[in-house]
């Protein structure tokens, strides 16, 4: 175990089924892993997991660090796991390619592309082809509309800090990168941290950091 000797354990489908079937209600799941190599025993490493009740539909996109699939201990990037798949696949890799948001319909992803500045939107229906690339962080951790058409920039994550590009929270077209004039938002909301749309796109929630001490 550890950085000098990383190990990966991949439970079988049957094992995951048994785990999820057994972990019901509020019962926690305890996982203990011991490594045996060359006559030496390392561990155990023990963790307690709480399995959420319910099912997830569609593809899951997530940030990853140090994955052997992306290149090992120093790698960073975005990966995805598809329904019934046993192994994740890379979407984007490299420094900065972790801070992302995917649209609810699975069509569009927005993400950081570089540090300290750079972001882009991607077409998830076309092998994550770039839709629009920006030299600032307007798309980084943005609140993306359910159909992927627009994104509200997430302030207080490099987007409005002087020197990092970007500015006050704005609404952008994910395909063109153009700013969409929004009278009810522009000049009213300046710092909108962690924005997220409701599933029907009728509401948006965020931490308003320009007033109210960051209250939602």
Where on the chain are the PLM-derived regions?
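Signal that preferentially marks extracellular ectodomain short beta-strand elements
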Residues: 2-26
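Surface loop/turn motifs at the tips and blade-to-blade linkers of beta-strand repeat domains
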Residues: 90-95, 132-137, 184-190
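Low-complexity, Pro/Ser/Thr- and charge-rich linker/hinge segments at domain boundaries
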Residues: 41-68, 135
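Beta-propeller blade-edge and WD-like acidic-aromatic loop motif
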Residues: 34, 71-89, 113-132, 156-184, ...
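Internal, hydrophobic beta-strand segments that form the core of beta-sheet-rich folds
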Residues: 24-38
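Blade-terminus and WD-like Trp-Asp/Gly-His loop motifs, strongest in beta-propeller folds
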Residues: 24, 51-57, 101-108, 141-151, ...
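Beta-rich catalytic cores
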Residues: 96-98, 138-140, 165, 191-193
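Residue position within the beta-strands of beta-propeller blades
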Residues: 60-66, 109-112, 150-154, 203-207
